Amino acid sequence: GQGEYTFPNGLKYVGEFKDGKEHGQGILTSPDGNKYEGEFKDDKRHGQGTFTFSGGNEYEGEFKDGKEHGQGIFTSPNGDKYEGEYKDGERNGQGTYTFGKGEWEGDKYVGEYKDGEEHGQGTYTWSNGEKYKGEWKDGKEHGQGTYTYPDGRKYVGEWKDGKRHGKGTY
């Protein structure tokens, strides 16, 4: 049925219940301003929903067992946007991250993620036109890759921890 419950810690749930648990459509708000609106299963965020953080960040997409899991879109007030796959609350699988205002404004990464970091095959394009296409490990260029400059010059070779390393050609 429908109901409303306020927890001793200040969390407030308004929505559907089943067997005394949050289950179905509902809204969960916290005293610090976080808000989740969407599907619940057995007292956990599960299915489609939107989580809005008190600082303005927002995740809209799939949840499983209380965590971001499946396809989702993350946005922040400065314009950062990630659209892609999540697993156990982290960016995992294929995704696109576009940077908003700040140090990396206009930069974009398209590729694979593991545990929230760029990992696997991916392409990073800087706002000045420079581009790296190749292998990534733990958020850094690592393995075989091609770095292209705006004027067309290229470096093709090996990378380690974000730096040119080993054999390569210009």
Region spans (language model):
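Hydrophobic face of amphipathic alpha-helices that form TPR/SEL1-like repeat modules
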Residues: 5-6, 28-29, 51-52, 74-75, ...
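Compositionally biased, low-structure terminal segments
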Residues: 8, 18, 41, 52-54, ...
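Conserved anchor residues at repeat-unit boundaries in beta-strand-based tandem repeats, strongest
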Residues: 12-23, 35-46, 58-69, 81-92, ...
